Design a protein with these regions (language model features):
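Bacterial N-terminal signal peptides
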Residues: 8-19
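Acidic/histidine-rich alpha-helical segments that form the ligand environment
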Residues: 40, 109-164
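Positively charged n-region of N-terminal signal peptides that target proteins for export
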Residues: 1-5
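Short N-terminal segments immediately surrounding and downstream of signal-peptide cleavage
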Residues: 26-44
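Short, contiguous alpha-helical
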Residues: 62-111, 116, 151, 155-159, ...
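Boundary at the C-terminal end of the N-terminal hydrophobic targeting segment
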Residues: 22-24
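Post-signal-peptide N-terminal segment of Sec-exported extracytoplasmic proteins
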Residues: 55-57
Length: 209
């Protein structure tokens, strides 16, 4: 009887060890990481919508120069890029093999992404597939598309248990980024181009109404 009890206890102990080991290997966002990502997504959502609020058709389409984007074009770029980054995160980054050994390569990049990307003194050329082509007819349609894209991003961040820190994808300028950094890049990119919208609005030839 004691032998059976002993073996039963051993089996239970092994099961508990396996369960603990499994939990230890499962990593997801910490509460602080989730809160930080959502805070930045919400802040840049609000700032962008505020920057385009109340613009007339003339203001919406005004170009400071032939080779510079209008508010409409910048807004389209923000929206298209968000959808592209989120799609790549889902279809490429998170389907790549987990590589926790790469974590050291991206250590400290959280704050760098949020500081460097919005800095308009660093110039970069958007790839052709992310450039504006007039995908939406007006400000309302563009706004609706942006709202839908941002809602998808924020819903994912709010609810996901994906292992965002152990899956990586290369960025042509920023190097390897884990899944969480790609999320931060969405908000940092929005901030960068919201600043660009403010530059357009500050142009001396920007329509008064």
């Amino acid at each position: 009887m004691y032998r059976k009890l002993f073996f039963a206890l051993v089996v239970i102990a092994l099961c508990l060890l396996c369960a603990v080991s499994s939990l230890a290997q499962t990593t997801t966002l910490t509460p602080a990481e989730r809160e930080n990502a959502l805070k930045n997504l919400q802040a840049t959502h609000d700032a962008f919508l505020q920057s385009i609020s109340g613009l007339s058709e003339k203001q919406w389409k005004f170009k400071p120069a032939p080779d510079r984007w209008s508010v409409a074009e910048v807004s389209e770029h923000i929206t298209v890029t968000e959808s592209a980054i989120f799609g790549m995160l889902q279809k490429q980054v998170m389907t790549s093999p987990a590589a926790p050994e790469k974590r050291a390569e991206v250590a400290g990049k959280d704050e760098k992404i949020l500081q460097i990307v919005p800095d308009r003194s660093h110039k970069a050329q958007a790839p052709e597939f992310l450039q504006p082509t007039g995908r939406w007819a007006n400000r309302a349609d563009t706004t609706n598309a942006f709202e839908a894209a941002r809602r998808t991003t924020m819903d994912y961040v709010r609810t996901t248990n994906d292992d965002l820190r152990d899956h990586f994808g290369p960025h042509p300028l920023l190097g390897p980024l884990d899944g969480y950094l790609w999320i931060l890049l969405i908000s940092a990119h929005s901030e960068r181009h919201t600043k660009q919208i403010e530059e357009v609005k500050a142009d001396p030839n920007f329509p008064k109404d």
